Amino acid sequence: MSNLWDLSQIQPRTDLVVAGDTISAMFWNAVEQRGPNVWMRQKELGIWRSWTWQQTAEAVREIAGGLMSLGFKPQETASILSNTVIEWVLADLAVLSCGGVSNGIYPTDAASQVHYLCEDSRTTVLFVEDDEQLDKALEVREQLPMLRKIVVFDMEGLHKLDDPGVLSLAKLRELGREFNALHADALMQRVKACKPEDLAILVYTSGTTGKPKGAMHTHGGLVYTVRGYNTLIARTEADECMCFL
């Protein structure tokens, strides 16, 4: 009897699935294939701003370069404490492209929860959305010996901040540009070195019956899910998806 959930032999109904056996490889192959096409939109001050695949790739390349300049190594964990914003996606893709593990943290979590999730995931770099989330990170930073840097997306109200352990996303991208100028092939070497069996993301449970547990998802598992979804649900290049969590 065939396995009901074995989708490996089914061919996709659409051409949306690009080549690649890791999420990072699929992303960079999609950039090459769809460069000038619009990929994401975000409303800023009431106006929708569009991001093409090429623009996304440029930002991801710079953030990834910045991470590598800070000594971020393959299979290290970077956590993201933020609402759903473009920067969340950029940071996530940069971490994965570096061969790292991405861990999302709810922006509604208290400082104590942020501490637990960062400690349990062995987070070395923490991305935070703004001053509100930064306050939580700073409150527990001394209890996180593995945490090396905190990166802030939105620096509004923080421009006078002078803390060697905290930098803006803009500064991280600047470091990335400098790093990439000296090590042009470093990022793609990381992407090519990533394997399907490598850990890609951690998704923590709600912790209703105890402490939250980090579900471990590999690149291979995520790619299999993407291909299965695109096999069973017909989509076109004109379709759009909304992120609301």
Each PLM stretch: what is its role?
Residues 50-54, 192, 200-224:
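Conserved AMP-binding A3 loop
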Residues 109-142, 225-242:
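Conserved ATP-dependent adenylate/AMP-binding module captured primarily in the ANL superfamily
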